[in-house]
Amino acid sequence: MLFVKERDIVVPGEKLAGNDYIAGRGTFIEEDKIYSSVVGLVSIKGKRIEVIPLQGKYIPKKNDSVIGKVVDVKFARWIVDIRSPYSAILPVSEVIDKGKKNLEEIFGIGDTLFLKIIEVDEVKKVKLGLHEGGPIKLEGGTLAYITPSKVPRVIGRKGSMIKMLKKLTNCEILLGQNGVIWVKGDKKMEEIVKRALEMIDREAHTSGLTDRVKEFIIRSIE
């Protein structure tokens, strides 16, 4: 007997299935029942059930800004990797330049895009759209990756951290709430920003972080 569905999000101790199923990774058995041992996403393959951990993964929400890479081009849509367990699509109907017949003339595989989540349906399929104004396709620069839950720390109180990063390095910086950050500027400065972001990700729980990051950047520039 199953107590959950494919792609359900579960928490530790949540009952998943009876003993007619095989316990996979991220699960444990107690009194002939299978339970989740982690926060994660249910995966059912035949009679095997497992839970894919979601730690560090991005759970999409409507109106979030995200940075993603085009991984496939299908009929009337692009498939975009947004660092989430859930698939994300950008329909051609959301794109301004509808006159082009070949979708790859607009966005091709490997292109990095700055997008907005328009909708997340009941089975967690993600529909993407464009921001009003601002860049869509991100040219050049480099990408940094942090834990999605640490993005507010990169912004800082009243934007203090992100303003400081931009001012000291003279880099363009765009934040995706999925933990993907685009940085464009002098190559040395791009690398300094990436290392500063790693520091923020690692030390987000500590106090006085903005001052320490500032000191690190100044030392690195000198």
Curated annotation (Swiss-Prot):
The protein's assembly and partners: Component of the archaeal exosome complex. Forms a trimer of Rrp4 and/or Csl4 subunits. The trimer associates with a hexameric ring-like arrangement composed of 3 Rrp41-Rrp42 heterodimers.
One GO CC annotation: cytoplasm
Spans traversing the lipid bilayer: none
HAMAP family (UniProt xref): Exosome_Rrp4 (MF_00623)
Subcellular location: Cytoplasm
Keywords attached to this entry: Cytoplasm, Exosome, RNA-binding
InterPro entries, sorted: Exosome_RNA_bind1/RRP40/RRP4, KH_dom, KH_dom_type_1, KH_dom_type_1_sf, NA-bd_OB-fold, Rrp4, RRP4_N, RRP4_S1
Protein name: Exosome complex component Rrp4
Domain KH: 139-200
Chief localization: cytoplasm
Pfam family, one: ECR1_N_2
Domain S1 motif: 63-131
UniProt keyword RNA-binding, yes or no: yes
Organism: Methanothermus fervidus (strain ATCC 43054 / DSM 2088 / JCM 10308 / V24 S)
Gene Ontology molecular function, alphabetical: poly(A) binding
Family according to the record: Belongs to the RRP4 family.
GO BP term (any one): CUT catabolic process
SUPFAM superfamilies per record: Eukaryotic type KH-domain (KH-domain type I), Nucleic acid-binding proteins, Ribosomal L27 protein-like
Stated role: Non-catalytic component of the exosome, which is a complex involved in RNA degradation. Increases the RNA binding and the efficiency of RNA degradation. Confers strong poly(A) specificity to the exosome.
